[in-house]
């Protein structure tokens, strides 16, 4: 953060949110390259191979392209066929991707500085483990066990392109950046496929920045609810909501509810809501009755549609009863499990038994969806029977083995919080046998003959690294009794969603 601060102290552009001059600064391309442009498609996947993309990248080409925009009244990048127009040996689609990610990096830097300055002196700045995806689950274990219902909401996409531009207008002050931003969106984006689940020419980094900016817009309703509730406690991100329109909406909400809808205001006095947003979805957990949950659903849908221009379909808001329904959350199936307990109480000479029930959050692995994802990537068939990975037979034996071991360890690491490890062992078995079949196919042998020739030591690499570490942490008796395999373990170093989660 201090490094970015030093780069952007050249004038008052940072204080006034003037971003357009940064496109023509020499050092900004070095900064953008270091900030992550060279790692645009770095392999964070556990199933797929690296795309040879970063070798084509050149920050000089991006700057050259921006400068050439002013040489003609029409840009050098035609829009009819992005894949067949070449400039310096690259397609027009490639150039748009480079410009879009550069725009995202330049816009991210001032906001990162402002966000970091707002947390100065606060304890949150040192809590790096909050970045982990698994850090959400211990929170849910403590909170969801006291709730009855959950609203599972699929976050909608903006119905019009101009809404995204209007969202940035309250944060970016100079018109030049907005015009450049609007031009890129209108000219090069296929808005019929504007979905995070579909293949789009939008760069992922560029898309996620726009998407999160827009989501923060209609998440502002929760600031109003927070003022009406003594229980709603959330991290304050004031820097993301510094705009006049937002405060105007909050005041308007308050006036409308107080004057015209006193009955509705009673619903908001003590809602006791916990809100989590993740992977294009969000959940709202509460202790309300089914009638009140339907009211919440109705009010949220209408507020987002009427005030934030978001086409929010009511069928994308599901009401789940935690004691009966499973909640699909970050690749886990979560539900409440009732554990009966018998407590023996003794008073003087009399003793009696008390039946008690303990509510516990149960997190399970969605084995059917994971097997479907493995089948789609040719690790097994739809029934879960392992098959050989034919496309990897050209690699060396060590490379094939390392690929399968890496996939197995990542899956084991991510799903270590499952309360039932049987499904996890089944997934690891599929990958282990798929590895053996792939090696046997490469050497034109059968699985039995291949294992007999090399021995069972070939598969010892599949022993996960966390098993070896946990054996040193826990007592030997505890580890030897196999109780460790029934314990849920949440890790604080998981920063990316597993590829098997909602994989299409």
Curated annotation (Swiss-Prot):
One GO cellular component term: chloroplast
Keywords: Chloroplast, mRNA processing, Plastid, RNA-binding, tRNA processing
Name of this chain's protein: Maturase K
Organism name: Barbarea vulgaris
Predominant place of localization: plastid
GO molecular function, one term: RNA binding
InterPro entries the record matches: Domain_X, Maturase_MatK, Maturase_MatK_N
A biological process term (GO) from this entry: RNA splicing
Family (UniProt): Belongs to the intron maturase 2 family. MatK subfamily.
Pfam families: Intron_maturas2, MatK_N
Localization of this protein: Plastid, Chloroplast
Domain of life: Eukaryota
Described function: Usually encoded in the trnK tRNA gene intron. Probably assists in splicing its own and other chloroplast group II introns.
Signal peptide: none
